């Protein structure tokens, strides 16, 4: 990042072990360089993948760990080589804060697929300092991994878009599914799923929410604007929906069967996996062969796609549905999130919280 300019300390809420319990933690931020922004965190969303990380579900966690990758903040200081941002700008950043800048993904605006990417927490930056996330008073981020939040989008509403929003937007664009008239399915109505309904509807798609029970029917149809609701245990309903969907977003973050949902896809339909699962998923090959169907995955989106998604949401008047909390409620919120007891994203009011 060039010559080092300044090192600062901040206080965040960190997990110390796989219990996942967060508590105040004061630490040094990495040194800021000429391409960096020093940012005061305003709001930070809570994603289900944060639970996987703080509880070491994937076997790769290092402690102390400050989670949070759906971050919106205010620029307090810019490095000498920063050109896109000024002090006072409201900006967002996500789960990737570094890349090699020379590989094929990096050179094609797909830096989230760089094999040398640096995660915004539970990783190590190029200077050897551990990266820490957005459940903290301040962060340091390179300008390449920051986007400006459009006027008209409130900070707490914008935060979940940095992950949940672009996780849906990116594959719709990349897989040629942006045109109106398509029929899409949303499997799982959580943080990503509810944005899937909103964004797909705004693109002119017919949207079916697929859930394990009937309890979210009214929310899906009347509040989020879905066109249809399908209960996966309803054999007749599932049979009637066979070969009806162009794509399905599978947002479920736990092990589940794939075959019932593959049956819902049309010829050349896509099952797009976006949920982080730490165990194998299974299916029999004829389920994809006989319909030339695809099981694929997608990981967040590039910074370019994030900018496009934010403008799309502003243009269409889309916001995330959230429950705003203070930091001292975060452990309760994480427990509720594990039980799917949130509509549909917790967002921490970091700037309004007592952190120490």
UniProtKB/Swiss-Prot annotation:
Zn(2+) 1 binds at residues 47, 69-70, 163. NADP(+) binds at residues 49, 167, 188-193, 211-216, 251, 275, 298-300. Pathway: Aromatic compound metabolism; phenylpropanoid biosynthesis. Keywords: Lignin biosynthesis, Metal-binding, NADP, Oxidoreductase, Zinc. One of its GO terms (molecular function) is coniferyl-alcohol dehydrogenase activity. Pfam families: ADH_N, ADH_zinc_N. It catalyses: (E)-cinnamyl alcohol + NADP(+) = (E)-cinnamaldehyde + NADPH + H(+); (E)-coniferol + NADP(+) = (E)-coniferaldehyde + NADPH + H(+); (E)-sinapyl alcohol + NADP(+) = (E)-sinapaldehyde + NADPH + H(+); (E)-4-coumaroyl alcohol + NADP(+) = (E)-4-coumaraldehyde + NADPH + H(+). Its cofactor is Zn(2+). CDD domains: CAD1. Its EC number is 1.1.1.195. InterPro entries: ADH-like_C, ADH-like_N, ADH_Zn_CS, CAD-like, GroES-like_sf, NAD(P)-bd_dom_sf, PKS_ER. It comes from the Eukaryota. Belongs to the zinc-containing alcohol dehydrogenase family. Involved in lignin biosynthesis. Catalyzes the final step specific for the production of lignin monomers. Catalyzes the NADPH-dependent reduction of coniferaldehyde, 5-hydroxyconiferaldehyde, sinapaldehyde, 4-coumaraldehyde and caffeyl aldehyde to their respective alcohols. Homodimer. This is Probable cinnamyl alcohol dehydrogenase. It comes from Eucalyptus globulus. The lineage of its organism: Eukaryota, Viridiplantae, Streptophyta, Embryophyta, Tracheophyta. The gene is CAD.
């Amino acid at each position: 990042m060039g010559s080092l300019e300044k090192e600062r300390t901040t206080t965040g809420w960190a997990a110390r072990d796989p219990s996942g319990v967060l508590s105040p933690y004061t630490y040094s931020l990495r040194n800021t360089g000429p391409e960096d922004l020093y940012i005061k965190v305003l709001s930070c969303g809570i994603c289900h993948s944060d639970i996987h990380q703080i509880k070491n579900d994937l076997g790769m966690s290092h402690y102390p760990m400050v989670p949070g990758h759906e971050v919106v903040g205010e620029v307090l200081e810019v490095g000498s080589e920063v050109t896109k941002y000024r002090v006072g700008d409201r900006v967002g950043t996500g789960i990737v804060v570094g890349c090699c800048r020379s590989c094929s993904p990096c050179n094609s605006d797909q830096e989230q697929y760089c094999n040398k990417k640096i995660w915004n927490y539970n990783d190590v930056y190029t200077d050897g300092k551990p990266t820490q996330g957005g459940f903290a008073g301040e962060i340091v981020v390179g300008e390449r991994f920051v986007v400006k939040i459009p006027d008209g989008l409130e900070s707490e509403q914008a935060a979940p878009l940095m992950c949940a929003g672009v996780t849906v937007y990116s594959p719709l664009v990349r897989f040629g599914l942006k045109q109106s008239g398509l029929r899409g399915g949303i499997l799982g109505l959580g943080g990503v799923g509810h944005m899937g309904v909103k964004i797909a509807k705004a693109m002119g798609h017919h949207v079916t929410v697929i859930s394990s029970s009937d309890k979210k029917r009214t929310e899906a149809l009347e509040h989020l604007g879905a066109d249809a609701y399908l209960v996966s245990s309803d054999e007749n309903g599932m049979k009637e929906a066979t070969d009806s969907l162009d794509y399905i977003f599978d947002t479920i973050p736990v092990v589940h069967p794939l075959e019932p949902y593959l049956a819902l896809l049309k010829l050349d339909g896509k099952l797009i996996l976006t949920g982080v699962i730490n165990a194998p998923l299974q299916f029999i090959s004829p389920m994809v062969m006989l319909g030339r169907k695809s099981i694929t995955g997608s990981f967040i989106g590039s910074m370019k796609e994030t900018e496009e998604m934010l403008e799309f949401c502003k243009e269409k008047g889309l916001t995330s549905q959230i429950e705003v909390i203070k930091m001292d409620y975060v452990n309760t919120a994480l427990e509720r999130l594990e039980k799917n007891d949130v509509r549909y994203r917790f967002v921490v009011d970091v700037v309004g919280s007592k952190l120490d």
